């Protein structure tokens, strides 16, 4: 097996193993995303005269709701993976091996970002109502950190040898170990590193959103909510294209790797979110136009 020919290859999913405690890359990257997100969001909140403490206040519920939503969404469409003989899995707790329901083992991978976005939005909506905060302004503050977190978190797929694309021999090909390949592609060694594509795309969106965020201070046409709508458009556009390369899609009415006879859920949701973003920008621009018309009239 000529694994050295691969441009990239995962070193494994474990960052540190202390025997009684194992730290995995996936969890480490999520933690890093949260810390960076707190720093950026608090800085953006100050620029909008929003109390930065609100970022810390919403954090626990935002994290919990996002993780639950992401996991719940994934498990629904992959229930066969967690049912029957696979219902329980082993968990090392301070050097004691116990059995827990496998759908709780989120550190082993298996989350869907669209589910996380739904859970996170519900948390933000409830928080803004309880604190009487302008929802669109608060969303615009949080969105740049969210897309950056998505960019960083995608590398968890790399360490877990998951969420890769169709076979390829391109120079940046990714080697996938035999045990991580779907049976349909067991004889292929190298695959599209779709996590890199999405990570880079999301980072570019982050740069774009940050630059527009600060332009809102001087451009009245960029109303609150514009950042959020642009995020829906940009992220969904990239995700739709990248999802078409993946061989592990969540399917509705079909089976992986290509959801024959069915739909790729991520692509369907991307179309919905993309359209929602366009409609949102249309109404924001219409509101700006009407405001200028009344002012000039």
From Swiss-Prot:
Keyword Nucleotide-binding: no
Chain positions recorded as a 1,2-diacyl-sn-glycero-3-phospho-(1'-sn-glycerol) binding sites: 154
EC numbers for this chain: 2.5.1.145
GO terms, molecular function: phosphatidylglycerol-prolipoprotein diacylglyceryl transferase activity
Any one GO CC term of the record: plasma membrane
Database matches in Pfam families: LGT
Membrane protein topology class: Multi-pass membrane protein
GO biological process, one term: lipoprotein biosynthetic process
Keyword Ribonucleoprotein attributed: no
PROSITE patterns: LGT
Compartments reported by the entry: Cell inner membrane
Entry keywords, A to Z: Cell inner membrane, Cell membrane, Membrane, Transferase, Transmembrane, Transmembrane helix
Enzyme class: transferase
InterPro entries named in the record: Lgt
TM annotation in the entry: 20-40, 58-78, 106-126, 133-153, 194-214, 225-245, 266-286
PANTHER family: PHOSPHATIDYLGLYCEROL--PROLIPOPROTEIN DIACYLGLYCERYL TRANSFERASE, PROLIPOPROTEIN DIACYLGLYCERYL TRANSFERASE
The family this protein is said to belong to: Belongs to the Lgt family.
Stated name of the protein: Phosphatidylglycerol--prolipoprotein diacylglyceryl transferase
Gene: lgt
């Amino acid at each position: 097996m000529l694994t050295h020919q691969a441009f990239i290859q995962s070193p494994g999913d474990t960052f540190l193993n202390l025997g009684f405690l194992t730290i995995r890359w996936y969890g480490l990257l999520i933690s890093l995303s949260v810390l960076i997100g707190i720093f950026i969001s608090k800085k953006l909140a100050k620029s909008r005269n929003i109390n930065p403490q609100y970022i810390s206040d919403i954090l626990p519920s935002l994290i919990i709701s996002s993780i639950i939503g992401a996991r719940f969404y994934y498990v629904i469409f992959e229930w066969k993976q967690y049912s029957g003989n696979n219902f329980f899995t082993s968990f090392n707790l301070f050097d004691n091996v116990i059995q827990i329901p496998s759908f709780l083992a989120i550190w082993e991978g298996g989350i869907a970002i669209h589910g996380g976005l739904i859970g996170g939005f519900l948390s933000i909506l409830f928080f803004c109502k309880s604190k009487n905060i302008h929802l669109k302004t608060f969303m615009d503050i949080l969105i740049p950190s969210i897309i950056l977190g998505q960019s960083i978190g995608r590398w968890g797929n790399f360490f877990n040898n998951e969420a890769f694309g169709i076979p390829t021999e391109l120079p940046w090909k990714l080697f996938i170990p035999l045990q991580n390949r779907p049976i349909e592609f067991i004889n292929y060694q190298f695959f599209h590193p779709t996590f890199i594509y999405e990570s880079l795309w999301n980072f570019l969106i982050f740069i774009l959103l940050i630059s527009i965020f600060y332009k809102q201070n001087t451009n009245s046409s960029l109303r609150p909510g514009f950042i959020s709508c642009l995020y829906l458009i940009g992220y969904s556009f990239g995700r739709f294209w990248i999802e078409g390369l993946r061989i592990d899609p969540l399917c509705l009415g079909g089976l992986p790797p290509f959801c024959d006879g069915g739909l790729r859920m991520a692509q369907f949701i991307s179309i919905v979110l993309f359209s929602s973003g366009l409609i949102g920008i249309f109404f924001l621009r219409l509101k700006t136009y009407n405001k200028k018309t009344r002012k000039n009239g």
